[in-house]
Swiss-Prot record:
Claim: Cytoplasm is one of the keywords in the record: yes
Gene3D superfamilies, sorted: 2.70.180.20, 3.40.1350.10
Protein name: Endonuclease NucS
NCBIfam families to which the protein is assigned, alphabetical: PRK04247.1
Key words of the record: Cytoplasm, DNA-binding, Endonuclease, Hydrolase, Nuclease
Lineage: Archaea, Thermoproteota, Thermoprotei, Sulfolobales, Sulfolobaceae
Pfam family, one: NucS_C
Organism from which the protein derives: Sulfurisphaera tokodaii (strain DSM 16993 / JCM 10545 / NBRC 100140 / 7) (Sulfolobus tokodaii)
Length: 252
């Protein structure tokens, strides 16, 4: 079921969000200011923006240009909506690492709620193919990432890709072509601990097109990282070397 409100008042929008945002995908377009506090600090002045709130706690904010959002919060974030004097606020809080996204809405042009079911996401290619893409453009992982060796053999197995981040910290990457599970996190953690004990510092990240809720919780508990491989796949959708097939999407 899909619901749409056009030019809702702040009062209407507040009650709509409280009723729907925990079970449905929310999209809204309105005039807002944004503050972010966490690993850095940023402030986005009043402008019209598209805001997406997902059932898993993800929040994404887009402006009128570029593919990447100007602000976002990952799955597992806690979202609080408040109706304050003359504004509607949406606060997204991530506990670890501690981050806070604060959106102040002054006017809404539309607000939607939709039931969206998960579909299958199949990549016609192997982990090796995805690693090849990263080696061609290391910034797909993050700015300044420097790959050193693929299939790096250690006593606990073979690391898909080993490198260093821009600060010189050893960075272990484990790639999966499908939704990551607890087993994948445990595998990464063994590799990560080896490099942590060997170098005194290390980072470990799991790269996959999806991750189970339990696996994501374990990632955060073990102070590892998750990289959504969809960012990488976006860059290859026009490439003949790979086929991305999304099927079994149910529509209401």
């Amino acid at each position: 079921m899909t619901q749409v409100l056009l030019n809702p008042s702040l009062e209407e929008a507040y009650h709509f969000l409280v009723k729907n945002m925990y079970n449905n995908l929310i999209t809204l377009f309105g005039d807002c200011e944004i503050q972010y506090e966490g690993r850095a600090y940023s402030h986005a002045s009043l402008a019209s923006r598209l805001i997406i709130i997902k059932v898993d706690g993800s929040v994404i904010v887009h402006e009128h240009t570029k593919r990447e959002p100007i602000n976002w919060q990952p799955p597992g974030s806690v979202i609080v909506v408040r109706k304050e004097s003359g504004v509607l606020s949406i606060e997204s809080i991530r506990k670890r690492p501690k981050e806070r996204l604060y959106i102040i809405l002054r006017r809404l042009y539309y607000l939607t709620s939709a039931e969206v079911n998960s579909g299958n996401f199949d990549i016609k290619g192997t982990e090796k193919d995805i690693v090849d893409l990263v080696l061609e453009n290391p910034n797909l992982i993050e700015e300044g990432f420097k790959p050193i060796q693929r299939e790096y053999r250690i006593p606990y197995g073979i690391v898909d890709l080993f490198g260093y981040d821009k600060f010189g910290t050893p960075f272990v990457l484990e790639f999966k072509r499908s939704k990551a599970t607890l087993q994948a996190v445990s595998q990464l953690h063994r590799y990560y601990m080896f490099f942590l004990e060997s170098y005194g510092k290390a980072r470990g990240a799991l790269v996959s097109p999806g991750i189970s809720e339990k696996a994501l919780n374990l990632i955060e508990k073990l102070r590892l990282e998750y990289i959504d491989a969809n960012r990488i796949f976006d860059s290859i959708t026009n490439s003949s070397r790979y086929t991305i097939n999304i099927s079994n999407i149910q529509r209401s």
